């Protein structure tokens, strides 16, 4: 996902600045699109992180997923963290920080309150031992492989070339510097 996303956004930025376009960009993949971790990831799109900097980055990321849900095979169903007492304080901190950055979520505390909230959503709710619910209204899930092909289509739509089934064998450096001037593959 990182390579495809970088190529896509770089192509947009080059065009915006009038310094080129996607045809200046080549992605080399030794196997195929979605063959690595992105193709087997669980596909959850959420903003449930303990690090404040990560939370702001993920809030931005969720907006990107929402920007083209069809291409990214994204389903905006929200995200819930349903927790026992041992996690309540940490989850409360996440909820406070989400509120501070304007990320829409609901935080429910207390065993009775949590059970009631969940019963309001699922009338057959039966789980015991929960004392907090963090319900993120944005977020959801994506069909991972379809999302990667959707992102590849967006990148190619901007002129980015994608070469699959190629192994990088060598980097050529220019003029005695560390600057890479060429990439040698087995194709």
Where do the PLM segments sit?
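Hydrophobic/small residue at the entry helix of a nucleotide-binding pocket
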Residues: 1-2
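Glycine-rich FAD pyrophosphate-binding loop
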Residues: 11-38
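Active-site substrate-recognition segment that forms the wall
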Residues: 9-12, 43-46, 67-78, 170-180, ...
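Helical element adjacent to the flavin cofactor pocket in flavoenzyme catalytic cores
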Residues: 134-187
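Short loop/edge segments at beta-strand edges and connector loops
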Residues: 29, 109-110, 164-166
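A short, glycine/Asx- and small/polar-enriched loop/turn
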Residues: 90, 116-128, 172-184
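Dinucleotide-binding Rossmann-like beta1-alpha1 core, especially the glycine-rich loop
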Residues: 42-121, 130
